[in-house]
């Protein structure tokens, strides 16, 4: 078992990572007896894991209820958010209630945002069940819902009290979802840790075989990197923006094609190739480094191409709404090597177009 701390002074919290954590109530023992707890999940995850979590809470002495939401990125919106608010209000829950987000990134983002808003803020716990949510979205306090005009445009920075990661959850995850999570795992190597990138190149097969030691190693390294970055820059005014490698292009794909048609990690993978090609055209990385990035994403069974139906104009329409845009100036996260990246402003549009068109040929 690995334990990592996100250091944010009085708002610091632990991340527990291991196999079989859903069998041990110790990870929820910080909850007081008779504590009211609402477990919020979706119709896919709840039948698999809700009873286990409710049983742990019962052993701790909590009073529990379960809310099941529809499953899918298309439900990460204000309508679903409102249904959570209605459930909480109709249940007469006061400010001492704790909510648990049991699911993937959609559940974590939506429930975290609901927790930040309900009666101006209540405690919540992240129990992520997908690889993507375990290595990325459950850590760091970004919470949000989507708007038809842009992804994650309505949200807040709001930290959980604890993150509990049971790697055994990944045994029920479809391979497509696992691959989507690998896009975020690979991202950490590209932007922050060349040695980890090399380790991933050598251990992809073990990860896809769900080797326990390999999974814990990879998830722990990703969480440690994110914890380090968030401790330095919680609200993304500096270094935290680097965690958005591939996301400016990727969010454009999701918004244009409709949320849920491409998984978030699939869009990030395609976006990472476009960002890497942009960097290579700008002279920031070599052809060999570009090829390593493309190769590892391809070997991880991820898309590396541009969606055929999307024009350059489609991309720019959405990218100019990106949260990193300042004073009308598009800023892109670009790799400067394997293991380093920076935010680059004012990339010429013809370079961006070349990068997008390059990915059409892959």
Curated annotation (Swiss-Prot):
Cofactor(s) the record lists: Co(2+); Zn(2+); NAD(+)
Positions contributing to NAD(+) binding: 71-76, 105-109, 129-130, 142, 151, 169-172
Keywords recorded for this protein, A-Z: Amino-acid biosynthesis, Aromatic amino acid biosynthesis, Cobalt, Cytoplasm, Lyase, Metal-binding, NAD, Nucleotide-binding, Zinc
Co-factor: note: Binds 1 divalent metal cation per subunit. Can use either Co(2+) or Zn(2+).
A single GO BP: aromatic amino acid family biosynthetic process
GO cellular component: cytoplasm
Record GO terms (molecular function): 3-dehydroquinate synthase activity; metal ion binding; nucleotide binding
Residues at which Zn(2+) binds: 184, 247, 264
Family that this chain belongs to: Belongs to the sugar phosphate cyclases superfamily. Dehydroquinate synthase family.
NCBIfam families: aroB (TIGR01357)
Name assigned to this protein: 3-dehydroquinate synthase
Species this chain originates from: Vibrio atlanticus (strain LGP32) (Vibrio splendidus (strain Mel32))
Classification lineage: Bacteria, Pseudomonadati, Pseudomonadota, Gammaproteobacteria, Vibrionales
